[in-house]
Amino acid sequence: MKFTTYTTFPEQTSNESLWILVDSEQLQSNLNTYQINNLESILTATQFKANFNETLPLFGQLSTQPHSQLLGLGKAAELQAAKLAKLAQTIIKSAQNKFKHIAIDIAALPVEYHYLFALSLTQAAYGYDEFKSTKNEFVLQQVDLISSQTSLDENQLALVHAVQSGQSYARDLGNRPGNICFPEYLAEQALALAAEFPDLLKVTVLNEQQMADLGMYAFLAVSKGSERPGRIVTLEYQAQLEQAPVVLVGKGVTFDTGGISLKPGLGMDEMKFDMCGAASVLGTIRALCEARLPIHVVGAIAAAENMPSGKATRPGDIVTTMSGQTVEILNTDAEGRLVLCDTLTYIKRFNPAVVIDIATLTGACVVALGKVLSGLFSPDDTLAAELQQAGEQSFDRVWRMPVIDDYQELLDSPFADIANIGGPHGGAITAACFLERFTRDYRWAHLDVAGTAWLSGSAKGATGRPVPLLMQFLANRVSTNG
């Protein structure tokens, strides 16, 4: 979906439908620029008050655009960012199967929300029908945004288009089933991205023999139970090689049965989403390539499948990580931290400026924060603040959680340097504390997206989060560093 901005309604246009956002406090003044026939009688007859998400079709009363509607904002001055998605869904649901080209007058919308509203439109327009015999009839391609004043300059529009591309790509990857999207498939996707952007991307793929040569036995303890071999994939975005890179590390467990510590059968199908951290890294790299931001970034994907078999790791097994630390694996369903710890050690070779790992790591984080906020863990106050700011700007929000030494003793093992679980309490925190032991040589943050990477129920599917957050974070660094 492509966006164009205008200061007034264009006289020469191919748009087929017009939506006018209206403030309940300034209903008449919002409509002064349009010659709407019988406006007073229409408002009186319908009792339209421009309450939030209230719609009023004009049924040909606007001569310049016969297919036009009003959409209420309520009191625009009190509008919250959380409501933008609902407005976007109302417009997209009405338009996307009918019109190729629509216009939306956003003059009544607070200027600071213009970027988020455009982004919300792209998110609402996403549909996944790859394996459906009958495809979705989505025809909407072009949206004109009209406002005499807007924050959507050329750079902001480019960022919207890039995030749309990357987030949709991440959602597609997340929605694909485990029999299609397995570790080698993720590696193939990375190589395909490099072929699409050969001037920007360098991709390296490690196989299991190479991992063994590097001593990555925590990672291999997860992948050994599956017939699908694991892969570690790095994608280097080479726009500014003289900079120390931002490294993004994604958990890519393409299907998680729990291994020998088998998960319950109910809802296990959703464990195809356990690679959404990796999907978000691939999506962010795609968005970077689309936006061509001048920044050095490395994406790393820890791709494995966690399956039970005669070769699978047993509870109580002890392995040596690439860092040299030993781990007692008390629960094979705490596998994400095992593939991540070796990957977090491996990426030290890039001499990173900062490292952010993204993982659907713990159910405990879902219990703590639900499906609204991602968990943010970092011992670095400055880095944490930058991520929180980017989350607010992109409305891909996070909540900072503790990662402090007080919790480390919960990971003590009588037989190894560390256990891979820390008992029944504070599970999201002890998981982050486990990872922290492998990240002490660089600035690091951990995003637990177990609650935000996908939705269940009628809206079931991958969300593509936190691609908007990560892209905003990177764009902010470009702006700050020039």
Curated annotation (Swiss-Prot):
Its main location: cytoplasm. It is found in: Cytoplasm. Mn(2+) 2 binds at K251, D256, D274, E335. One of its GO terms (cellular component) is cytoplasm. The keyword DNA repair does not apply. The active site is at K263, R337. It holds the Pfam family Peptidase_M17. GO terms for molecular function: manganese ion binding; metalloaminopeptidase activity. Its EC number is 3.4.11.1, 3.4.11.10. GO terms for biological process: proteolysis. It catalyses: Release of an N-terminal amino acid, Xaa-|-Yaa-, in which Xaa is preferably Leu, but may be other amino acids including Pro although not Arg or Lys, and Yaa may be Pro. Amino acid amides and methyl esters are also readily hydrolyzed, but rates on arylamides are exceedingly low; Release of an N-terminal amino acid, preferentially leucine, but not glutamic or aspartic acids. Mn(2+) 1 binds at D256, D333, E335. Binds 2 manganese ions per subunit. Its cofactor is Mn(2+). Keywords: Aminopeptidase, Cytoplasm, Hydrolase, Manganese, Metal-binding, Protease. NCBIfam families: PRK00913.1-4. Belongs to the peptidase M17 family. Presumably involved in the processing and regular turnover of intracellular proteins. Catalyzes the removal of unsubstituted N-terminal amino acids from various peptides. This is Probable cytosol aminopeptidase. It comes from Acinetobacter baumannii (strain SDF). The gene is pepA.
